[in-house]
Structure formats: C-alpha cells, structure tokens
C-alpha cells in the first residue's frame, strides 16, 4: 500500500519549524488566499481577533493611525516595504503560519494526531509554536479556535506595544541604510562582542538578539549604533588585511557579511522591556490569559534566541538520519538557517512554505532529499585475524593503513625513509622534486631496490612547476616511465 510523505510523518520522527521577522509574509498570505476555503478561514480568524481587541481598540488606533488590513499589502518577495511595520508584520507572520497549519490539515496532516517531536519557532515564530501546541491540546484546529484567535490578537498587541515604545525612545526605524536589527555572518560571538565594545557614545544597548549558528549572530539596538558597529567591522577588516599584506599576521582576514533586517523594532532587546508590560496591560483589559501573553511578549520582544542550540537539541531527541524538519515559513530563509546548523547530520530539511510545496508532499511517494550524513565517511574499526584494523576510503582503495609518507622535498628525496615506511606496510612516496638528474634518480632507485622487501611498492610524487624536471622525468627523457617499465 502506498503511503504519501505527508501521511508518513505521523509515524516518523519529525519537527515543524516556523520563521520570524523580516520574512515575506504578504507573499505567503497572497498564496494562501488563492484557496477559497483557506481565504475564508483566515479572514474569519482575523475578524475574531479584532473583536477580542475591542476594549483597547482606541489605544491601538492611536498607535497605528488607521485600521490595519493584513490582506491589503502588495506581495513582493524582494522587499517588505510597508508590510515590515511591526503593527502589521507580527500578526501577519503569525497569520500565515496559522494558514500553513490549516492547509496541512486540509491535506491530511493533523498536528494533534501526528504529534511532532518538536515545534521550533525562530524569533517570533514562537507564536506559531503556541498555536501548534494549542491545537495538540485541544485535539483539532476547530477545537482550538478561541485560543488561536487570542494568540493572533496578542500578536497584534505585541506589534503595537513595540511600536509605541520605540516612539517613546525616539528610535527611528531607519538611519540611512541601517535598521534596528543587523545580521553579522562570519564572526564568532567573541568577535561580535568585541565590536560592540568599540562603539563609543552608543544611544542604547547593543544586544545579541539571535544566535543562528556558531558564526552567525543578529544584533538589536538603535540603528545609528548598529551603523557605528558596521564601521568598526570595516575598520577591523582593513586593519587585518594590512597586517596580512605586510606578512605580520596569518590566517583568515576578518570579513563578516553584514545585512540589515527589514524590521521596525529592535526585537529581543532590553529596549523592549516596557513594551512587554504594555502588552500584558492591554491583554488584561481584553480578558486574555496574562501569563501566556507575558511569555509570548518576552519571547518576541525581550529574550535572546539561541536558534543554534534549539536545533542541535533535536540531535539527541532522535536519530538525525531518520529525522525530518519541515519548514512552514513564511519564505525559505529559515530552511537555509536550519541547513547551516544540521549539515553533515543526515537530517532532512523539507520546504513546505507554499500551497504548491505542501500539495506536492501530500502526494509524494518517495523521500525528499536529506542532508549528507558525514558519519558515512567516518573510519571504522574491524577485527581481523591479524588484529583490529582501521577501515577508511583510503584503506579500501589502496589496501594499506590510512597513514601515508608524502613525497616532500627534501625529506623523502633519499630512499631510506621511503623504503622503511613501505616495508612497514604504509603508502610511501619518493619526492620527485629532488630527483634533479638521471644519475641522482638512478642512484636512489638502486638503493630502493636493495632495501625494499619483495612485493613492496613506492609511489613517485611529482609537481611539474618547471620545464626541466618535466622533460627529465616524463617528457623527452622519460626516466620515470622507463624505470617503471623495467620493473
């Protein structure tokens, strides 16, 4: 009996993953609303969330300036534009993730029944995590409807409270090209912290908001402070490049990739502490679960996100070679972040961010591609009558232990060490760079013939960086092929 991939997830270890800010949520929403039933359901949830917010509607309107229409933004995969504003984006991202869960249920995948091993939320993706857990607890999306509407409403409160707070702080969402969040890729945490310390007269704290991997961090703060940090990074790059040019410094020159995120708030920053309190206050006026509201607001606005650790925790929860992580978006940025963390583990990262991708998975009989499992290349120990032996690709190819004596002038020009290594059963190379005349070569080969045991072999290592050696060894004189042909 054929079982499609989406159905198989119910019996295989898997995790769901949801993206956060600066992702193309209007594109995802426009895609979802092409399905009439999904469009109707999403509009119904938004209307219900708005009704729940009636007690604080005047406060919200004072912040947004006009009612927010989540369905009215022009989808643009390259740029969010006005849709980046937190008064729309926090709820908008969460809405598309609810849409993905609704679509999965229409296709036969129920979160409540499949019980994923984990549900991961990157940054504000934690809102979708709470949605998924609410569905699991209630048994279905329909049964969890009231909780889902409340979480959507809390998302709107978080965006409005954060926006109100940055205005109180005088934090502009733009300072030239700078925004309140800066991605720094290609730098360790220690290097990032060193750059932070070099920013003089900062207007506020510069915090590491998100740790995507060991060398990819996202900072939050005033845009002008982040712009100053970017200048410090450029100065450090030029300083190290000069030292390298002068041959005073080795290694890789510090050269991180910097990218400002398209956001209007410094998410995951102590600057947002008062916004958390404002969110909880509004939630209380609406009669919401204040403990859950505080937890959500702190996760989105205040707390550091160690995405690297969250993903790696899955390695111990299940056999990585059997685990699937399903990226539900919006956009495919999160799948790339996951891929960077899980490379070499064999974990399968599955993109399910669009109606088309999810539909394909619902009829897929084969398996999606997994990441390469580097354990397949690890050495193995086998027991033989001659004792324990190490097996590698090299040993299978050559029949010799995975240790070699490389041809390197001047060390292996003389034959004694080469013969000793070969007689001990190792791959041994005679350095061609030192065989500078036919007489020298013949003398060394004669010594090898005397010292090598019967059946032992050596390899000739040659790098032809000048025409003389090429002509001597393999060109017109051909001293090496002739010696090989003679046995």
Language-model region placement:
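Gly/Ala-rich beta-loop-alpha elbow adjacent to hydrolase catalytic centers
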Residues: 117-125, 129
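Active-site entrance/lid segments in N-terminal catalytic domains of soluble metabolic enzymes
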Residues: 368-487
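Solvent-exposed alpha-helices and their adjacent loops that cap or buttress functional pockets
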Residues: 7-10, 111-113, 173-176, 200-201, ...
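Acyltransferase/transacylase module recognition
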Residues: 1-116, 266, 270-370
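Short polar catalytic/cofactor-binding loops
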Residues: 18-25, 187-190, 409-411
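Short, aromatic/basic amphipathic alpha-helical patches
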Residues: 195-197, 232-233, 336-345, 473-480
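Alpha/beta catalytic cores of group-transfer enzymes, especially the acyltransferase/condensing modules
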Residues: 131-295, 299
